[in-house]
Amino acid sequence: SYYCSCNQEGDDEYYCASEEIIKYYLDPRNFLTEITIFQFLDLSNNEDISVSKIENLVKGTFLDGEANGMRYAQMIYDASKASGESAYSLVIKIFQELGKNEKENMPHVVSGNDEKYPNVYNFYNYGAKDGENNIELALEYAKNAGWTTPYTAIVEGAKLLSSSYLNQGQ
């Protein structure tokens, strides 16, 4: 048994991990599936990721297009440079939060067409919570942050993501 010596009396739910199990979970070769391998993805900016590679990743989604004369892929590329976060990681985060809707179905929180919050964008769903008014909360957050263009929302949101996660040693 690997009972932890730091456990309090009566706290028998936690056990120390064996060296063998730690080695297993730290070895990416044990997780070579199309889903589990991504837990080892380096989230920091990779200079080899070009705008064209980002274009391929977002092809057919709501990010396959442009706003204010700039392609979303270019915005994500710029956000990666400004934040130090991998462009792939940023795209994955946006898809995780908003889905991959087809090009014609822009998620409401990034459409800029909300009656109460016109020209406000939140690509990372900051401020949203589970419940009925999650979109309103996300748009309120974006309004207070000054995210009034898609470019600003993508770049500044990436900086926030990086400062609260990647740059904290996570």
Residue ranges, per PLM feature:
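Substrate-binding clefts and substrate-entry loops adjacent to catalytic sites
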Residues: 58-66, 70, 119-148
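Non-transmembrane alpha-helical segments in soluble domains
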Residues: 91-94, 158, 162
